[in-house]
């Protein structure tokens, strides 16, 4: 492995030095492209979870089912003489995001106009924070599998307007413009070029999504357009300066983003490897798009064709001043962050990393609480929680919206763990309680639905013939033995694999109320111990 030293060639100018030796990470070769290093930076545009737009009082119209141009103010449509009014809720959520990403809050920031002409921008400029953003110098740690945490620096966080939505009508050769989204609040979160693979880029976006959702700043749904990514990719020989970066615009899923980065690495590497002189060969600096059908990037424009945005301060918006008290109040109200949730689930409930990943991958999964003490092996709580999250996902509900309280969930888990009901019955009981909310406790519903487990052996390992459930289970086992004489003969001849057929019959007849291991032990005792009197 090779370490790139920042102090080499000290005679270089400072900008060149920063560009050339910004990488302090230890190089680890990727077998997919040996001898080459990949450098990736990401710009994410997260739609702020505010009911109102950033500079007007209109409702944020991001619901695709709503009719077009329903939530539009004169300012959103760029009527002459209209003035912006900053939404303080958007500012607070941007501060909350900056604190979660360990950024330096700028107590004085300002807004600029970014000029360009396009049909989805009525005013001809976008209000953003190019020169004095609301936050600088943050960090987000990402956890790759079988690796230590990778720190990714956040260059800046800035507030800006979203554009309108344009839809091309190819038959009429016109674009339909919907201004419902125009003026909605966005946060642009810009990372430093600290990522070294498509997988790291994907993990960065997933981790950022988890943070934004945990603090309530954004839905982070790429499929619905509330989180969009632009990536900058460059390739260089190991030990050489970073190559020319190419930007890939408007990636709307983690899968497509990783595919776009992979194709761009292969494309740039092919250009450099085909050159006769690697010292003088460079990749053309371009802005590129991504074809979701072919999984390839394509050229949009070159550096020479790039527009001059002519940034200038917005004269209608003054300096945004944030007091220490305001920032501290937001800091004090920060909820539990994903890495804190992960630590709590690991320490309090002894969950595995895989189970924690399942919980954190589902919206509101972090809100699940377990009543009582830890499981000995964690299996009971995990199985019921997986079932709960699956049912809520199918119903499109969150944990806080459903009628099942954490107290009742804890009691249900206890019923499974102490053997009162089987895991199969526990899942059935959970589905019943979600479908038919009731004030009855899980134990009462268990009796009502006759879900009590058919126990076969006590903790001492011997059956209890006086138990009603034992007698019922013994009757079911004897009935199965009587109905399957050929299988019984095979078991007595030493072929114990055939016993599974007998056990399966008992399980079906018990409707999931019997434990498979207990049934197998009881069937074996009845057959080999002479319990079959047929």
From Swiss-Prot:
Any one Gene Ontology BP term: mitochondrial translation
Similarity comment: Belongs to the GatB/GatE family. GatB subfamily.
Pfam family, one: GatB_N
Keywords: ATP-binding, Ligase, Mitochondrion, Nucleotide-binding, Protein biosynthesis, Transit peptide
Single GO MF descriptor: glutaminyl-tRNA synthase (glutamine-hydrolyzing) activity
UniProt superkingdom: Eukaryota
SUPFAM superfamilies found in the cross-reference section: GatB/YqeY motif, Glutamine synthetase/guanido kinase
Origin species: Laccaria bicolor (strain S238N-H82 / ATCC MYA-4686)
UniProt-listed Enzyme Commission number(s): 6.3.5.-
Matches recorded under InterPro entries: Asn/Gln-tRNA_amidoTrfase_suB/E, Asn/Gln-tRNA_Trfase_suB/E_cat, Asn/Gln_amidotransferase, Asn/Gln_tRNA_amidoTrase-B-like, GatB, GatB_Yqey_C_2, Gln-tRNA_amidoTrfase_suB_CS, Gln_synth/guanido_kin_cat_dom
Ranges in a coiled coil: none
Swiss-Prot/TrEMBL catalytic activity: L-glutamyl-tRNA(Gln) + L-glutamine + ATP + H2O = L-glutaminyl-tRNA(Gln) + L-glutamate + ADP + phosphate + H(+)
Subunit structure: Subunit of the heterotrimeric GatCAB amidotransferase (AdT) complex, composed of A, B and C subunits.
Name of the protein: Glutamyl-tRNA(Gln) amidotransferase subunit B, mitochondrial
Compartments, record wording: Mitochondrion
